[in-house]
Amino acid sequence: MEAQQHGDQLKRGLKNRHIQLIALGGAIGTGLFLGSASVIQSAGPGIILGYAIAGFIAFLIMRQLGEMVVEEPVAGSFSLFAYKYWGSFAGFASGWNYWVLYVLVAMADLTAVGKYIQFWYPEIPTWVSAAAFFVIINAINLTNVKVFGEMEFWFAIIKVIAVVAMIIFGGWLLFSGNGGPQATVRNLWEQGGFLPHGMTGLVMMMAIIMFSFGGLELVGITAAEADNPEQSIPKATNQVIYRILIFYVGSLAVLLSLLPWTRVTADTSPFVLIFHELGDTFVANALNIVVLTAALSVYNSCVYCNSRMLFGLAQQGNAPKALLNVDKRGVPVNTIIVSAIVTALCVLINYMAPESAFGLLMALVVSALVINWAMISLAHIKFRRAKQQQGVTTRFPALLYPLGNWVCLLFMAGVLVIMLLTPGMAISVYLIPVWIAILGVGYLVKQKNGKTVKAH
């Protein structure tokens, strides 16, 4: 299917409030609401420290991306920076890897949607729910970017209000005594200690924790459609650290005080489970609505992100020119449709392997995310060196350059080692060389066909 040709320019339809809430929405997603369950089982209350460490690394990456985006706000975000400052293969590989990453994230979140629906209707297979919301969200994204922005704005508002309310309500239950005798801050250290399985238990969970932060860099993708990226991008980036502290560290500290961590199960959102265990059915149902909203929010962002990344690849000559078609509303219809067709594989995966689908997709996401973040840090090093040679002082410099970049790269290497030692996740690491080889073949085919373009 091909959209009517109306040019190849995206409209700058995202306001500052959209950018801020898109950044916030990226920080509150399935990783926190569902992925944290398995981490709690292995790391206990130490999960709080794990999220703080991974959050700091995510913030460093965000500042590196933010510095580049403020200087050059373009569609395709960092793949263009890799292309321009590192080389054509780096741009080709990072762009396609990012697209595949968000296709996988989209699949994982659609799977999570199915799990949340089963809280109310256990008899409905996950693939049915995934298929229904797949159609709805893609239809919405085919309207215009303002509709996406408004939808994500309100999704994020719901998530923020809910998490803050949960922290306040949970704190009240904790300190008023209304949470029952098991609700006490001593749960953070009395059930086998803060790190019941030692640092090993925490370290082995860092890969899954990292999954939670896989939406933060979406801010960089919004730059091409932001009214004033020079102001909105730095503001959104700097606020990430506070959001991580409040929404991850704060919410988990309250939750793990309300109920011993040993009562958490891996296949249910700990947020919903804890209030359900406390006998508060109303709050449990309300929170399930929130975690469902969170998954839909991230999937909504994925649809947006995938289409814009493909658009950026097409602009660079790294994807078919037909993907540059933009309709009269400024929507890249072809890229949305192509991304949707690939994401539809999620429905098939959930049909064939409903029990293991989420775990498999999460492992694949983390591997792609490691490549993604590593390439952001490496591209940023090249970017900064180029600017220094040009005598240019950037407006939004990254923190701790270049030490921060190397710390991030060391962290990524550590995550890969952890995944190799984790049953069920090692396969995704073994697939990395295969994936790079596929990218290499694709690049050679593109070069042979003479479709190279000059970076601009």
Protein language model features and the residues they cover:
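Helix-loop-helix connectors at the membrane interface of multi-pass transporters/channels
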Residues: 1-7, 80-83, 109-130, 162, ...
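C-terminal membrane-solvent junction of multi-pass transporters and transport-like membrane proteins
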Residues: 154, 322-331, 370-423, 452-456
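Extracellular loop-to-transmembrane helix junctions
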Residues: 11, 34-129, 133, 240-249, ...
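Membrane-helix boundary/coupling elements in multi-pass transport proteins
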Residues: 74, 97-112, 213-226, 281-321, ...
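TM-loop-TM module centered on a large, flexible mid-protein loop between adjacent transmembrane helices
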Residues: 80-82, 87, 119, 205, ...
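Membrane-interface "cap" regions at the ends of multi-pass membrane proteins
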Residues: 1-36, 41-46, 58-63, 72-75, ...
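Helix-loop-helix junctions that connect adjacent transmembrane segments
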Residues: 5-10, 48, 121-125, 157-285, ...
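Membrane-interface loop-to-helix entry segments
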Residues: 114, 127-183, 213-214, 237-241, ...
